[in-house]
Amino acid sequence: MESSSSDYYNKDNEEESLLANVASLRHELKITEWSLQSLGEELSSVSPSENSDYAPNPSRSEKLILDVQPSHPGLLNYSPYENVCKISGSSTDFQKKPRDKMFSSSAPVDQEIKSLREKLNKLRQQNACLVTQNHSLMTKFESIHFELTQSRAKVSMLESAQQQAASVPILEEQIINLEAEVSAQDKVLREAENKLEQSQKMVIEKEQSLQESKEECIKLKVDLLEQTKQGKRAERQRNEALYNAEELSKAFQQYKKKVAEKLEKVQAEEEILERNLTNCEKENKRLQERCGLYKSELEILKEKLRQLKEENNNGKEKLRIMAVKNSEVMAQLTESRQSILKLESELENKDEILRDKFSLMNENRELKVRVAAQNERLDLCQQEIESSRVELRSLEKIISQLPLKRELFGFKSYLSKYQMSSFSNKEDRCIGCCEANKLVISELRIKLAIKEAEIQKLHANLTANQLSQSLITCNDSQESSKLSSLETEPVKLGGHQVESVKDQNQHTMNKQYEKERQRLVTGIEELRTKLIQIEAENSDLKVNMAHRTSQFQLIQEELLEKASNSSKLESEMTKKCSQLLTLEKQLEEKIVAYSSIAAKNAELEQELMEKNEKIRSLETNINTEHEKICLAFEKAKKIHLEQHKEMEKQIERLEAQLEKKDQQFKEQEKTMSMLQQDIICKQHHLESLDRLLTESKGEMKKENMKKDEALKALQNQVSEETIKVRQLDSALEICKEELVLHLNQLEGNKEKFEKQLKKKSEEVYCLQKELKIKNHSLQETSEQNVILQHTLQQQQQMLQQETIRNGELEDTQTKLEKQVSKLEQELQKQRESSAEKLRKMEEKCESAAHEADLKRQKVIELTGTARQVKIEMDQYKEELSKMEKEIMHLKRDGENKAMHLSQLDMILDQTKTELEKKTNAVKELEKLQHSTETELTEALQKREVLETELQNAHGELKSTLRQLQELRDVLQKAQLSLEEKYTTIKDLTAELRECKMEIEDKKQELLEMDQALKERNWELKQRAAQVTHLDMTIREHRGEMEQKIIKLEGTLEKSELELKECNKQIESLNDKLQNAKEQLREKEFIMLQNEQEISQLKKEIERTQQRMKEMESVMKEQEQYIATQYKEAIDLGQELRLTREQVQNSHTELAEARHQQVQAQREIERLSSELEDMKQLSKEKDAHGNHLAEELGASKVREAHLEARMQAEIKKLSAEVESLKEAYHMEMISHQENHAKWKISADSQKSSVQQLNEQLEKAKLELEEAQDTVSNLHQQVQDRNEVIEAANEALLTKESELTRLQAKISGHEKAEDIKFLPAPFTSPTEIMPDVQDPKFAKCFHTSFSKCTKLRRSISASDLTFKIHGDEDLSEELLQDLKKMQLEQPSTLEESHKNLTYTQPDSFKPLTYNLEADSSENNDFNTLSGMLRYINKEVRLLKKSSMQTGAGLNQGENV
C-alpha cells in the first residue's frame, strides 16, 4: 500500500509538471500571436503607400494580415478598412501609370517598390512557416491532453483496483512507460519553444526593415506633393496662355487687313498673266490634234493586247484540264487510303493486348529515325532539283552570249531535251521514295505481329502471377482461421502479440500485391495510349507521302508548260528585235524636239524667279509678325506663372483648413451630383458653341473664296493660318471653360468649409479618404495640363513646318520667275534676228520639209513599234502578277501540305529576287533582253566614232531632258506627298487598333485580377475557419468573450465582403469612365489632325492643278518656238554653243538629281538607252525639227496619263476621308450613348456607397467597443503577471527555509537512531517502516514535493491566477512545517515506548481520502480547477497528519 501511494504521488507530480509545461506553451503561443499582430499592423500601415505608387495585386496585403492575425479579430477588423483605401488608390494609379511618363523619378520608385515587395514576400513566407509551426504545436498539445485524460482514467482504474496485488506491477510498468513518453514530449515542447524564440528574433529584425521601408514611403509621398504643386503651376500657365491667345487673335485680325491690301495688288499682276495664258491655250489646241493621232495608234495596240489575252485564256483552259486529271489521281489516292484504313482497323483490334513499354519506345525511335531518313531523301531531291535549275540558268546564260539568229533553234531543242531528262529523273526519284515508304510500312507490320506474340506471353505470365497471389491469399485466410480458433482458448499477453504481428504482416503483403497490380494497370494504359499515337503518326506519314507524289506530278506539268511558253517567247522576241530598229529611228527625231523645249523652259525659269522674290518679301513680313506673337506668348507665360504661385498659396491655405475641419460624406455626394449636372449643362453649351464655330468657319470660307479667286496659292496659305488660329481659339476656349469649372468647384468647397468650421474632428478616416480623392483629381488635372502642353507644342511644330514649306514654295516661284524673264529676253533677241533670216531660210525650208515628211513617217512607225514593245512588257508583268496571285491562292488552299508549300516558297523567292534585280519579268525574257543589250553595246562602239558630228543634237536633247526631269520631279513630289499622307492615315488606323487591343488586354487583366481576388478570399475564409476552430479548443475559459467576438467577426466579414464588391464595382466603373474619356480626347485630337491634313491635301491638289496649267501654257509657247526653229536650224551655230554650255550645267544637275530620285531611275535608264540607240542613226542633220515635234506629242500623252492618275488618287483620298468622317460620327454617337449609361450606373452606385458607408460607421463603433474590451483584458493580464512574479520570489525564500529544516530533521533522526541501536527485540529496519515512514518521511516528502511542484508550475508558465490562492498556499505550507516540528518529539517517544505495537488502521483515513479524491471529477482543463485540486490535497494532508497524531495518543492511553 505504501509503494502504491508513493507511485500515485509521483504520478501526480508528473501530471502537474505536464500541465505547467502546457501552460507555458500557451503563454508563448500568445506572445507569438501578439508579435505577429504587431507585424501585421505595420504591414497594413506600409501597404497603402506602396499601393499608391503601384498596386497591381491589392489582395496580397489582405492575405498577409489575415494569415498573421488568427486570434485577434479586433485587429483583423481594422485591416479591411485599410484595404479599401488601398484598392481605391491602387486602381487609379494602375490606370494612370501608362499615361504619366512625364515624371523623372518613376524608375527609382519602381525599383524601391520591387525591393519592398520582395521583402514582403519573404516575410509572408516566414509568417506561413510560423503559422504551420503553431498548428503543429497545437496538434501536439491536443495529443498530450488526450494522453493525460487517458492516464487519469487509468489512474482511477488503478485506485479502484488497489486491493488486487497481481495487477499492481503491470500498472507500475505502464506508468513508467507513460512517464517516459511524457518526458520525451517535454523535450519536444522545449525544442518548439526554442524555435519560437528564434522566430521572434527574426520578426524583430523584419520589423526594423519595415520601418525603413516606411521612411522611404514617406519620402515618396513628399515627392508626390511636389508634383501636385507643379501641376498647379501648370494650371496658372494655362490661364496665361489663354490671355495671350486672345491678344494673338486681335493681332491676327490686323494682319488679315494687311494681307487683303497686298492681294489686291497681286490681282492686278494676275490679269497680265492671264493674257499670256490665252496665247498658250492656242498652242495647246495644236498639240491636242497630234494627241488624237497618237490615240488612234493606241487603239491598234489595244487590239493586239486582246489577242494576247485570248491566248492566255487558252492556256488557262489547259490548266483546267490538268486540274481534272489531278482530281482523278486524288480519287485513286482516296481508294488507297480506304484500304489502308481497313488495315489500320485490324491493327487497332490487336493493339489492345499490347502492354510492354520499352518495346514500344524502341519502335517509336526506329520510326522517327526512318522518318528523318525519308525527310533527308526528300531534301536531297529538292537539292537536286535546285541544282538542275542552276544548271539550266548557266546554260541559258551561255546561249544568250552567242548570237541569237544562228543558234535559237538549237537552243530550243537542247532545252527541251534537258528538261525532259530532268523531269524523268525526278519522276524516278519520286517513284523510288514511294516504294521505299511501302517497304517501311510492310516492315512495321511484321514487327507489330512479333510484338503481339510477345504481349501474349506477358499476358500468360500475368495470369500465372494472379493464380499465385490467389493461392497466397487462401493460405493467409487459413492461417487467420487457425489463429481465430486459438484465440478462443485462454492465452497470455505474449501469445496475443505474436498473432497481431502475423496479422500485420499479412496486411502488408496484401497491400504490396495491390500496389503492384495498380502499377501494372497504369503501365498497360500508358502502352495503349502510346500505341494510338504511333498509329496516328503512321497515318500522317502515309497522307504526306500521297501529297508529295501529287505535288511532284504538278511540278512536272508546270515545267512542261513553262518550256512551251519559253519557245513562244523566243519567237516573239525575234519579232520585237525588228520593231526596236524602227523605234531607234523615231527616237532620233525626238532629239530635235527636246532642243526647242529647252529654250522655253529658260523663259519659264525667269518668270518663276520673279514670283519667288515676291514670295520672299511676304515671308519676311510673316516672320516679323511671328516674332511679335512669340514675345506676346512669353509675356502671357510669365503672367500665368504668377497666377499659378498665387493659386498654390491658396491651395496651401485650404489644406491647412482641411486638417482642422471634418467633412461629412453625404454632403460631398450631394455636391458631386450638383457638379455633374453643371458639367452636363456645360457640355451642352460647348456643343452649341461648336456648332456656332462650324457655321462661322463656313461663312469665313465663303468670304475668302469670293475675295481670293485670282491667286489661289496665297489664299490657301492665309486660309490655313486662319484655320489653325481658330483651332487654337477653340482649344483655348475649352481650357477656359475647364478652368472656370475648377474655380467654381474651389469656391463651392470654400463655402462648405466655412459652414463646417463649427464642427469638430469626429471622423479622421473620412478625411484621409477625401485627401486621397483630391490628390487623384489634382493628378488628373496635371495630366490634362500635360496633354494641352503637348497639343500646343504640336501646333507650334505644325506652324514651323508650314512656314518652311511656304519658304520652299517661294524659292521655287522666284526661280521660275527668273527663268521666265531670261526666256523673254532671249525671245526678243531671237525674234529680231529671225525676222532678218526668215527670208533666206524659206527656200531651204521647203526642200527640208519634203525630207522631214518622209522621216516623220518613219519616226511614227518606230514609235508605234516601241509602244507595242512596252505594252507587251507590261502585259507580261501583269501576267506574272496574276501568276503570283494564283500561287498565293494555292498556298492558302494547301495549308496542311507543308512540304508542297516549302517548294513553292523556294520557287517564289527565286522569281522575286530575279524580278527586283533587273526587269520584274520572267528569266527567259531577261536573258533575251541581255542579248539585245549586247547588240546595243556594239552599236555604242559605233556611236563613239560619230559623237563629234552629234554634239549639237546631244546638247539640245540634254536641255529638253533636264526640263522633262524637272516636270517629273514636280509630279513625283506630289506623288510622294500623297503617299506620305496615305502612310499617315494608315499609321493612325494602326494606332487606333493598338489602342483597342490595349483596352482589351486591360479588360482581360482586370478579369484575371477578379478571379485571383475571389480565390484568395476563399483561401482566407478557409484559414479563418481553421483559426476559429483552434481558438475554440485553446480558449475554453473565455466562453462569453469568444461568443461576442465571433458575432462581431461575422458581421464584419459580411460588411467587408460587401465593401469589397462595391469597391470593385466602383473601381471598374471609374476605370471605364477614364478609358472612355481618354478615347474621346484621343479621337478629337485625331479628328483635328485629319481635318488639317485634308485641308493641306486640298491645297496641295489645287497647287498641282495650277502648276499643270502653267506647264501647259509653257508647252504651248514651246510649240510656237518650234516653228521658228525649223527655219533657223542652219544659221544658229552661235546659239548652239550657248546651249551646249547650258547642257553641260544641266548634266551636272542631272547627276545630283539621279541620287535623290530613286524611284525615277528606271525611267531615266530607259530614256538613256533610247538616246544611245538614237545617236547611231543621227547622221541626218535636217531631221531635228521633225523629231522634236513627235517627242512633244509623246510628252503630252504622258502628262495626260499622269493627270488621270492624279485625279483618280484625289478621288480615292476624298472617298477615304469621307468614310473616316462617317466612322468618326458613328463612334461619337456610340460614345455619347455609353456616357449616358455610365452616368445612370454611377448614380445607382453612389446610393449603394451611401448605404455601405452607414454600415461602415456601425461596424467602426462595434470595433471600438471590442478594442476597449481587449485593452481591459491586456491590463488585467499585466496585473496578474506582476502578482505571479511576487509569488515566485516568496516561494524561493520558502524553499531555502525548507532545506534548512530538512537538514535539522536529518540531524535529529540520526541522533535518535544511535540512541536506540542496543535494543534487543527490534531492528532499525523494522522501526522505520512502521513509525517513521507514515509520519515523517511521507509528510516531508509530500510537502517538499508540493513545493517543488508549485515552483515548476509557476516558473514555467506565466498564466493568471488569483493572489489569494498564492497566499493560502504559502500560509498552509508554513503551518504544516511547524506542526511537523512540534509532533516530532512526541511521536518519537511513543515509538520508543511501544516498539512492538503496530496500528493497522493508521492509514485508513488516507486511503479513504484518496478514494474520495479519485471519485471526484477534478477540472484539470482550467487554472481554477487545478488550484482547487492543490488546495484539497494540502487540506487532506493536514487531516491525515492530525488523525495519525490522534491515533498515536489513543495507543498511548490504551
UniProtKB/Swiss-Prot annotation:
Positions in coiled-coil regions: 107-138, 170-402, 438-464, 508-1309
Broad class of the protein's primary localization: cytoplasm
The entry's keywords: Coiled coil, Cytoplasm, Cytoskeleton, Phosphoprotein
Ribonucleoprotein in keyword set: no
GO cellular component: centriolar satellite; cytoplasm
Disulfide partners: none
Residues found modified as Phosphoserine: S45, S1355
Residues covered by region (Disordered): 828-851
Compartments, as annotated in UniProt: Cytoplasm, Cytoskeleton, Microtubule organizing center, Centrosome, Centriolar satellite
UniProt protein name: Coiled-coil domain-containing protein 18
Biological source species: Homo sapiens
Gene: CCDC18
